[in-house]
Amino acid sequence: MLLGVNIDHIAVLREARKINDPNPLDALSICKLSGAEQITIHLREDRRHIHDNDAKAIIEQSSLPVNLECSINSDIIDIVCKLKPSRATLVPENRNEVTTEGGLDIKGNFEKLQKVIDKLHANEIEVSLFIDPKDEIIELSKELEVEWIELHTGTFANIYAMLYSNLASTHHSIKELELSKSELKTKLSKSIKQIETSSKLAKKLGLKVAAGHGLNYQNVTLISKIPEIEELNIGQSIIARSVFTGLKQAIIDMKELIKND
């Protein structure tokens, strides 16, 4: 199982004090030496963490492939084409969101996506679509002739957290998931099944399958066991653990959990 380490949250720490430390660039060699196969960053329209100069330096200096997450905003796509990351993962964006809340609306943006994908391909950039695990969306993604899809695991992660962590007893409790344990277990089972079904369909259609969002040290093994998924992109939980263990050990710990024996 390949691991892409999202280093956005190093920039989040920097931006919390509006200074130049910590520098996300310093994470590159640690990620490689610790066994990561990819660096993932998100160049948001609002530049809330990673900035243009960060993205440029990371892409130029990383010895690992860089997966650049971005919206389909034309100005952002122009920047991505100049930066030339190994891969661009197209994601939805909402300025008011804390983090990405769901997958792309493929059906509603099909024509615009086709133009964006064609432009990225013309610049020799591999393309992935960040999507919800639904069969119709998988099939539309295939029509768009992308190389990858990344399945949004946020719903799965939220259900898992409400069931097996103390999230429900905190001020971050997810109101719509304040259900009985039996109801949450049923929802979790259905969520995993849908991810499995979508992964199988995508693989059958010739798409490479990644997954990410909300994955952590507690829930990741349920996703890493799905054989059709080749890659996981994980950020916040790794950076959070690194505060206590150091980044190298945090990555090693995650690699150990997701390895395929």
From Swiss-Prot:
Keywords: Cytoplasm, Pyridoxine biosynthesis, Transferase. One of its GO terms (biological process) is pyridoxine biosynthetic process. GO terms for cellular component: cytosol. 3-amino-2-oxopropyl phosphate binds at residues 6, 17, 214, 235-236. Belongs to the PNP synthase family. Homooctamer; tetramer of dimers. This is Pyridoxine 5'-phosphate synthase. The gene is pdxJ.
